[in-house]
């Protein structure tokens, strides 16, 4: 159950960060409304708050979170940008998730 909760929390954190960064991108690069900055700021605040909910030390959380972020960003590429990931994108995502699993769920010895 710990693993499932941790993975869900990482996914929610990644989505909050990606949305918080994507909305200003739409404003700056795709002529979106400046009002996009309001939900972007809320999403980034949610991202920061979600980081505080992770059940391990901050450095370990940030390191492991990076692997989930990479994978969610590749899925975003496909779902939102409409660009199908390459085999290399998928292999890199799998490698990043493997690193996350080792960091988060590997044995802890003092």
Curated annotation (Swiss-Prot):
Short name of any one Pfam family annotated for the protein: UPF0060
Record protein name field: UPF0060 membrane protein Nmul_A0351
GO cellular component, one term: plasma membrane
Residues passing through the membrane, by range: 7-27, 33-53, 63-83, 87-107
Family, per entry: Belongs to the UPF0060 family.
NCBIfam families: PRK02237.1
Keyword tags: Cell inner membrane, Cell membrane, Membrane, Transmembrane, Transmembrane helix
Cell membrane as UniProt keyword: yes
Protein topology in the membrane: Multi-pass membrane protein
Species this protein is from: Nitrosospira multiformis (strain ATCC 25196 / NCIMB 11849 / C 71)
Location of the protein in the cell: Cell inner membrane
Main location (coarse class): membrane
